């Protein structure tokens, strides 16, 4: 089983699809990596040689932010917005949608389950 960037790639899938299991690599970047490495995208992971795996590992480490580094970067960017106190940061802090979506009826994913206010007494 090939291990790249701390992720075990599934053996029976095509290498083009397997690379997308790494956080930060999608289909298009996967194709670009394989082109740079000179590997056929239809090759299965189990059929890769150790040379090809090391070449992939080298390209990914050199040119891409993936896994832990990328997650840390994203979290730091969100924290920076919150510290600045800008509109987007405030929306993140309150757990509301950040990109201008309506919140009157929808946005349940972001807001969480409904919290009903206490009943009104006479």
UniProtKB/Swiss-Prot annotation:
Located at the top of the head of the 30S subunit, it contacts several helices of the 16S rRNA. In the 70S ribosome it contacts the 23S rRNA (bridge B1a) and protein L5 of the 50S subunit (bridge B1b), connecting the 2 subunits; these bridges are implicated in subunit movement. Contacts the tRNAs in the A and P-sites. It comes from Syntrophomonas wolfei subsp. wolfei (strain DSM 2245B / Goettingen). Keywords: Ribonucleoprotein, Ribosomal protein, RNA-binding, rRNA-binding, tRNA-binding. Coiled coil: none annotated. GO terms for biological process: translation. Belongs to the universal ribosomal protein uS13 family. Part of the 30S ribosomal subunit. Forms a loose heterodimer with protein S19. Forms two bridges to the 50S subunit in the 70S ribosome. This is Small ribosomal subunit protein uS13.
